[in-house]
Amino acid sequence: MLAADTSRSRAYLQALVRHDLLPSRVLMLPAPSNRLLPGQSDASAARPESAPANCEDDLWSEASFDPTEPLVETLARAGILARALDRDDINDPDVIAEIGACRESVFIYSGYGGTLLGPELLATGKRFLHVHGGYLPDFKGSTTNYYSLLAEDALGASSLFLSREIDSGPVLRRSKFPPPPDRRAIDHVFDAAARSKVLVETLQDYAVSGGWRFALTENVGGSTYFIIHPVLKHIAILSPGVGDSCG
């Protein structure tokens, strides 16, 4: 696993521990300066008073994670082998060399947003399993779940193997989620919880089948979105829809 210490990575790792899907090792990316997107800060936001466990189909079952628990604490408690990398750039030659030297063929990727994996990293032969915060191929790009809320009154998450094109690799699993009971906590809690749910289900399917099964081998079409304007984000947060009763 390649992970930055964000709320997303904290949700992932706690979910993997809870479901006994431990990574063989975790390489931790240090925090860069002035390069964080929503959901990628130090994850100090408080979680909701109660997890929405009664949502339909238990879709928000991973929302009860603790966003204030640092990765190092979760790693130590679970006894997972971990090492902090010296560089924050996933495409740095030293980072690429270290990843290439690992025996693992697949890495769960939970780094900082806004960075595409370069051709040198992809040429190592490793596969990078990423969970995109959006329903593919319809919603590609950044902060897509706010656009999804405005367009469909739903959130999405899709697991895929990364390629050189943004959010365009083959999709293993994708799910839609009802609006969370507290839309103000999307960045630090519910976006991460939706992705964690899809990640866990993707890995559970692999554990059962012994291979990677794809929901969408040709991830084409859809729209690519850019970081949402604060006014539109505010509207998405404050506009309750038909699905908001699950809290």
Regions found by a protein language model. Give the residues of each.
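One-carbon transfer enzymes
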Residues: 1-247
